[in-house]
Each structure stands twice: as structure tokens, then as C-alpha cells.
């Protein structure tokens, strides 16, 4: 191999490395953002689960439908 070919290969490898480093940085930022989004969604799901449970408990503690007077058409 000539010196020129070795230098060209080295330059090519350096460019590939730079591109890969940039890609890794971009992917790392994306993973970080998605992790934050997932954490927020998990909080929202927990809140919704608690709210649903409260609503179900409130419904079950309401008066018995048999205790209510019949509708006016009876």
C-alpha cells in the first residue's frame, strides 16, 4: 500500500468515527427524552388508576337503587 492509500483509508475511518459519534449522541439524547416521557406517562397512569378506584368506590357507596322511589310513570 502506498502512503496515499493509507492516508485516504485513515481519513475515511476518521469520518466514519465522527459520523458514528454523532449518531450515538443523537440516539442518547432520544433515549433520554423517551425515558423522561415514559416516567411522566407512568405517573399519569398511576394517577388515573387511583382516580378510577376512587370513582368506583364512590359508586359502590352510593345508595342502593332498590331504595330509590320508582319513576313517575309507575
UniProtKB/Swiss-Prot annotation:
Kindly name one Pfam family recorded for this protein: SlyX
**InterPro entries xrefs:** SlyX
Query: HAMAP family, per this entry?
Result: SlyX
Protein name (database record): Protein SlyX homolog
Q: Where is this region: Disordered?
A: 52-74
As recorded in Swiss-Prot or TrEMBL, the protein's gene is named: slyX
Q: Which domain of life is it from?
A: Bacteria
Which family is this protein grouped under? Answer: Belongs to the SlyX family.
Amino acid at each position: 500500500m502506498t502512503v496515499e492509500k493509507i492516508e485516504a483509508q485513515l481519513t475515511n475511518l476518521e469520518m466514519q468515527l465522527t459520523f458514528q459519534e454523532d449518531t450515538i449522541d443523537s440516539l442518547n439524547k432520544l433515549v433520554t427524552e423517551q425515558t423522561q416521557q415514559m416516567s411522566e406517562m407512568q405517573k399519569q397512569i398511576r394517577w388515573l388508576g387511583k382516580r378510577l378506584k376512587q370513582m368506583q368506590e364512590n359508586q359502590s357507596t352510593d345508595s342502593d337503587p332498590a331504595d330509590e322511589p320508582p319513576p313517575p310513570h309507575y
